[in-house]
C-alpha cells in the first residue's frame, strides 16, 4: 500500500446514513484594533452578511438529485483573502484555483531549510504497526501571510505532529509550534478575513480552531472526528483544508462526513479574538447506492472542499462526487439539498476544481480497476447544470506507477486554455480545457503527488526524485521547455506556495524549504 494509505487507522464497517442539522444562534462580537504587526488589520466587513435565504427542501436519508440553481456571476480566480496578501488555504480560494503570485524565481537557490538540523518526523501507529513518518505529506501546502512592513509568515503542517509558524524570509520560528497528538497531515487554513485564527486538523482525531494573538498558539475549540457524528466511517484524520465563507467554516473529514460550522468570530473586551463555534450541518459523504457497489467502506473525504454559488462540492475515496446547496444554511437555516451526484468509480482524493464558467474538473486514482473507471477515465470535466448527464469529456490515465496504481493524486491546475495534471505514474500532462485533448506530456520521477502550480506563464512541478521543475508555458499547446530544475534531495509530495519572488515547499525527507533567486 502507498505511504498515504498506511497513514490510515483501521477501517470501520459500513453504517447507515444519518443526516444531522442544527439551527444556529446569530451573534457576532464587535471588531477591535489589531494587535500583532505580522498580520494586517482585519477588513471592516470581516464578518460578512450571509447570503439571502432561498427556499429548498430538507435532505433525506438517501438524498436524490435535482437541478441546481442557475449560476450567478462567475467568480474570479483571485485569493479568498482581500484584507492582506497571501495564500490562506490550499489553492488559495473557494474554487481551488488561486496559485499565488509572481514573479517566480528564475535563478533559484535554497536560502533556508527548516529545521536547519534534523527532520520533521514522528512515529504513528496504524493497522500495519508503528513506523516513522517525515515531512509535510501529500496534502501539505504552506499558508503564506504577508503582514505589515512586508513581514511574511509561513504556516505549515508536519509529520512531527505539529503546526509550525516561520519567518518566510529566514525560516526562523516566529511563534511556538502547536503540538498535536499525532501526524498533522492536512493543509490548514488561515482566516481570510483578518481574524487571528488558524483552522487545522490532526490525525489525533481533532480539528482545531486556534488563536494566534496570544503569546503562543492557543486552541479555542476542537471537533472530534470520532464523536461529532453518530456514525463515523473509515478513519478520523483531517486531510482537507477548510473554507471560510462569511462566518461559516466548511470542512470534510476522513470520518466520511462534511461539516458546516458557524464560527461566531469576534473579540472580547481585552481585544482578544473569540469564537463560539456550533456545528449547524453534517452531511454524509456517501449514500446507500455507493455502499452497495463498493467492495469496502472506504468512503473518506480527503480533499479540500470547493464552493460556488451557494453549492459546496467534494468527493470521497469511494469515488462519489457530490454538490450540496447549503445557501439556506449559510442564511441561518438548517436545511440543505443535494443537487449533484456523480460516481467516478475510483478513489477520488484530489480536490474538485471549479472554473469561471462553473464547470467541475475531477481527478481520480486507479486502484480498484472498476468498469466505471474504464468508462469515465481518471480526469473528467463535469457540468453540474446538467446533473443527469454531466460528463463533458473524460481522459483515461491507465499508466501504472507506485504500488501498481494509476490515475491521479494531485489536484489539477487550470491556467488559460489548459488544464495541467500530474499522475501517479510520473507524467505531467497538458490538455486543452475545452476539449480534453492531450497536447503534450513530460515524464518525471514518479509518483508525482505534488499539485502543479502555474504562475506568470511558468509551471512548477515537484517530483519524487526530489527535483523541483519550472517549465515555460507561454506557448501552451507546445511541449514546454524546462527553465530550471532544483534538487531538494527527497521526494516532493507536497504542493509549493509561491509569493513575492519566493517558493516554499516541504519534502518527504522532513524539511521545509525557502527558495529564492540567487543574488549577484
Model-based region annotation:
Residues 1-13:
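Terminal targeting segments of Actinobacterial cell-envelope proteins
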Residues 19-31:
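Hydrophobic membrane-insertion alpha-helices, especially the h-region
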Residues 30-38:
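Juxtamembrane cytosolic interface motif at the C-terminal end of transmembrane helices
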Residues 39-79:
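N-terminal low-complexity, Pro/Thr-rich disordered segments
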Residues 63, 67-85, 90, 97-136, ...:
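Extracytoplasmic/lumenal domain signature
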